[in-house]
């Protein structure tokens, strides 16, 4: 019986986190939290755009950030007009932000491992390539 409840708890927790992200965090400090994340990621992209060895990571990250920013603008515009717009898309938005954050972490890992010949670094790049 315990195992049957785990999925419900997981979904409920994700739903609560999604509502918190859209309802509180996104508007907190006039959106500066997400703006700061975007600036950090954009700076990383600019610094590493010419690195051929991690170009697939940078391209994936660029695409992901564009989607997050477009989705954020939509949420800000449509969520203000009708809160149901924001609430109904909160879980999808949470997933998008989470996957973008993971893409950023994989890109940073690839940069760190770039040019290192130890097997664990080569494995990290291969693993990251699989997930992005």
Language-model segment annotations:
Residues 1-50, 125-132:
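Glycine-rich phosphate/cofactor-binding loops in nucleotide/flavin-utilizing enzymes
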Residues 25-28, 43-132:
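C-terminal amphipathic alpha-helical interaction region
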